[in-house]
Amino acid sequence: MSYWCEATVVDGIVTRAVRITAGVDGRIDDVTAGVPRRDDDIALGVVMPGAGNAHSHAFHRLLRGRTHGAGGDFWLWREAMYAAASRLDPALYREVARAVFAEMLVCGYTAVGEFHYLHHRHDGAAYAEPHAMELALAHAARDVGIRLVLLDTVYLAGGIGAPLEPRQRAFGDGSAVGWLRRWHALDAALPVDGLVTLGAAIHSVRAVSRGDIRTVVDGLPPHVPLHVHVSEQPRENAESFAAYGLSPVGVLAEAGALGPRLALVHGTHLSDADVAAVGAAGAHVVMCPTTEADLGDGIGPARRLADAGARIALGSDQNAVVDPFLEMRGLEAGERLASGRRGCFDPAALAGAAGAGGYAALGLGSHALAVGDHCDLVEVDTASIRTAGSALAQLPLSATAADVRRVVVAGRVVADGGILVGAGDGTGTAGTDPATLLRSAIAAVDGDAAREESR
């Protein structure tokens, strides 16, 4: 399959008349610039590397537009999140994830890292198929054609030194060894198709002890990407210091987790010493600007982290907003508000965080529309009410998800003008507007909750 692009925008460089050829493995075989279109080329307009959503909780999408009436903070919002989690079984989980992944796809995300901890029944018992919830996510990704890195998460405690609460029992595996046993079994059970890969996550230092973090790190293959929530709230820092005399970053470093494969999610409340340690380790930091704003988390030290050597990526997290352009803009907006300066991250750096940064944090390799890279790309409308007149290299600060036209994953068009083209899997998603899938999934979850309440 070959695509002739009117222009590509990579690392802030605009290149005209580019042919990108994808091989049967879905990777780029050839890139040639300054060439005329051939009859067998698929013609695209302005193309950018697809965005890699480095942090998502798909089921949190159920809360969009439903948690703003009572004010509160992150901890109050978490109560609503637990209630949403309690409604899900494998069938509903697949339906919700399929709808959310479809929304991501048409909005310009070509890959997603799903930070997944809904492993078991609500009472903590395993399903008859022990990987039912994980396979639901894998099937959902294949249903729509998005690239998925399943970040299977270890979650063992309800707080430092505290047991899981009853509403958290679905998250736990009893011990770090028990989680590792299930993780390796899942690795063997996931079909190998190039679209879905397995990663790992530690929920947080609140949910996994220092000793268990060490066990997890030692028990995982060294190539597997490892993610962890870090310092999203000041309370987490206070609890970590009270228990260990260390910040969460310090705990991770002491447990052997801090290094180039680690992706720290949020990092909103890091000390100068934390920033230096993360940068020196060459770790990834996944900022989630729209979620951090929605939950009132604060503004993280993104520029200082990047200057220290950390690699910045972006994620939609709770999916209150699904728009990679707004995440890019939010990263820069936070820095401007905190510093009083413009241009803390230039457009090329913002696009790099959304694209190459996300793919690197997810262990997906280089992502620069180069030979050997995944052929994952998005076409952007440059003549819309938002983008008309914009310099192509500055699209990260003018476009939105509404400007995404065609989306290509693994060398195949999977979305066009906000509509799924179809992954060729026989699930009937071709021609579907993701809004239809979302309405259906939300209605199914709401109906299930209503039936429970009436019993």
Predicted segments — roles?
Residues 1-36, 46-47:
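N-terminal metal-binding scaffold of metallo-dependent hydrolase/deaminase domains
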Residues 374-425, 430-439:
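C-terminal cap of metal-dependent C-N hydrolases
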Residues 254-257, 261, 303-383:
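His/Asp/Glu-enriched, well-ordered alpha-helical/loop segment
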Residues 125-265:
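Metal-coordinating catalytic core of metallo-dependent amide/deamination hydrolases
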Residues 65-147, 178-193, 439-450:
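Alpha-helical scaffold segments that flank or form the walls of functional sites
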Residues 8-17, 295-297, 302, 359-397, ...:
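Acidic, glycine-enriched loop/beta-strand segments at the rims
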Residues 62-96, 121-130, 157-177, 234-259, ...:
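Active-site gating loops and adjacent loop-to-helix segments of metal-dependent hydrolytic enzymes
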Residues 49-61, 225-232:
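Histidine-centered catalytic micro-motifs
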